[in-house]
From Swiss-Prot:
Catalyzes the condensation of carbamoyl phosphate and aspartate to form carbamoyl aspartate and inorganic phosphate, the committed step in the de novo pyrimidine nucleotide biosynthesis pathway. This is Aspartate carbamoyltransferase catalytic subunit. Keywords: Pyrimidine biosynthesis, Transferase. The gene is pyrB. It comes from the Bacteria. L-aspartate binds at residues 86, 169, 223. NCBIfam families: asp_carb_tr, PRK00856.1. It comes from Syntrophomonas wolfei subsp. wolfei (strain DSM 2245B / Goettingen).
Length: 312
């Protein structure tokens, strides 16, 4: 089956079948990255560019690595040293990149909806690598892949998303993705970090961590996004940690085999204790590995012409 769409801008409009296709395609991709020789010629002759207007370690690097593992020519545009700093408009930047012959652009931008604007104004395929507080589809896909790999299914799981829901594109994409599989999704955090009307997305909202994680299969911890916040949303990081930090002790109300996820980077001692972050229950490093596999799957499906098999 081919991923029959030009762009991947979010999970909200992605069907369950398309989601399953991406997750299933990531399985052989992970086999590739776990072997000694990781290079396959599948996308030889294709060209990929990453354009990040916000800082990134995991997403940008994993997309670059995914492209190289698939033999695509992969270029990272450094916005801080580009003509953007000379006042070049977004539209002109995108057109300049397009006429160089790139097939696909991976874009991150601080303003919600920017990748959608770009997709409407270029022939290149576009993958949204995070747009403001809107969506981060590939993060949610790698989270879902990690959960399915460990649990064997995504069907009807109980999932708690903890922390800064208001500013989190990761939370929104996870809600859109997991809801396709009938998951019981709970969001928990301070009232000032809970977006109004979040229940309209089919989730239950909580302000008590103990209540929210009672009997859950998965806990996805969100980073406190200090760079997006105005002052006064909560009294202090210390008070936030007292109420919402996950530690081995706070997991007592969850299931014994609960999975603990975090998109990174983590703020140790704020959202998650170092003891829990470094424990076997926390899948933070596995998420990073799976992120490469998911992004390889997307590049293959979007640039590989829909071939049924990977070329080894």
């Amino acid at each position: 089956m081919k991923l029959d769409r030009k762009d991947l801008l979010g999970l909200r409009d992605l069907s369950r079948e398309e989601t399953e296709l991406i997750l299933n395609t990531a399985i052989p991709m992970k086999d590739v990255i776990c072997r000694d020789i990781k290079k396959v010629p599948t996308l030889r002759g294709k060209a990929l560019v990453t354009v990040f207007y916000e800082n990134s370690t995991r997403t940008r690097t994993s997309f670059e690595l995914a492209g190289k593992y698939l033999s695509a020519d992969t270029v990272n545009l450094s916005v801080s040293t580009s003509s953007v700093q000379k006042g070049e408009s977004l539209r002109d930047t995108i057109k300049t990149i397009e006429v160089m012959g790139f097939d696909l652009m991976v874009m991150r931008h601080a303003m919600s909806g920017t990748p959608h604007y770009v997709a409407r104004n270029t022939r290149m395929r576009v993958i949204n690598a995070g747009d403001g507080a809107n969506e981060h589809p590939t993060q949610a896909l790698l989270d879902m892949y990690t959960i399915k790999e460990k649990k064997g299914t995504l069907e009807s799981l109980k999932v708690a998303i903890v922390g800064d829901i208001l500013h989190s594109r990761v939370a929104r994409s996870n809600i859109y993705g997991l809801s396709k599989f009938g998951c019981d999704i709970r969001v928990v955090g301070p009232a000032t970090l809970m977006p109004p009307g979040i229940e309209k997305l089919g989730v239950k909202s909580y302000y008590s961590l103990d209540e929210a994680i009672n009997g859950v299969d998965v806990i996805n911890i969100l980073r406190i996004q200090r760079e997006r916040q105005v002052s006064g949303l909560f009294p202090s990081l210390d008070e936030y940690a007292q109420l919402y930090m996950l530690s081995p002790q706070t997991l007592a109300r969850a299931k014994d085999d609960v999975l603990v996820l975090h998109p990174g980077p983590i703020n140790r001692g704020v959202e998650i204790s170092s003891e829990l972050a470094d424990s076997a229950q926390a899948l933070i490093n596995e998420q990073v590995t799976n992120g490469v596999a998911i992004r390889m799957a997307l590049l293959f499906l979007m640039m590989g012409g829909g071939r049924d098999e990977i070329t080894y």
